[in-house]
């Protein structure tokens, strides 16, 4: 039997006693991350009926669940992830790497020449435990997401992305400011206090 580290025991204790974990189970969301998007949307109204959006790194699907609920039948939600994701009503899911041409071709066929109103991205790399390496890999994913957003968003569109404060943060913020009229930071209550994660919201794509 494997012996758990102190850090993994602490995480498990925190998870079991987490208010948002219990809420997610009660409300039918696949992960507590749903409440981060709900809180941001309550403030910024980036998702509303009729919104056309893409959810990058969507699995297990809590953000796509929220998006489908908020866009309603008049909106469109595309979800992309390398990992499998169980079907969600109102969500068109593509399993694959959005950097690859065949995956982009599938997405663009579904998009049918419509520009996106919004791109959302709650991706994070598999953590190795090496802080420097993990931070670099995290921002690499963020850069890929920003490139995707810059190519597919309509003029005036928005981009919401999770980043981790540290090396590369200021440079990434500057890159977003070149593409969007405004860039704001958001730290939802559902984000754990000990986490360095923060969300950047770019609005009014140039």
Curated annotation (Swiss-Prot):
Keyword Transferase among UniProt keywords: yes
Catalytic activity: uridine(2552) in 23S rRNA + S-adenosyl-L-methionine = 2'-O-methyluridine(2552) in 23S rRNA + S-adenosyl-L-homocysteine + H(+)
GO terms for cellular component: cytoplasm
EC number: 2.1.1.166
GO molecular function, one term: rRNA (uridine-2'-O-)-methyltransferase activity
Subcellular location: Cytoplasm
Keyword Cytoplasm: yes
Lineage top rank: taxon: Bacteria
Keywords: Cytoplasm, Methyltransferase, rRNA processing, S-adenosyl-L-methionine, Transferase
Matches recorded under InterPro entries: RNA_methyltr_RlmE (IPR050082), RNA_MeTrfase_FtsJ_dom (IPR002877), rRNA-MeTfrase_E (IPR015507), SAM-dependent_MTases_sf (IPR029063)
Residues annotated as binding S-adenosyl-L-methionine: 61, 63, 81, 97, 122
Active site: 162 (proton acceptor)
Coiled coil: none
Entry function: Specifically methylates the uridine in position 2552 of 23S rRNA at the 2'-O position of the ribose in the fully assembled 50S ribosomal subunit.
Family: Belongs to the class I-like SAM-binding methyltransferase superfamily. RNA methyltransferase RlmE family.
Name recorded for this polypeptide: Ribosomal RNA large subunit methyltransferase E
Organism (species): Neisseria gonorrhoeae (strain NCCP11945)
Species lineage: Bacteria, Pseudomonadati, Pseudomonadota, Betaproteobacteria, Neisseriales
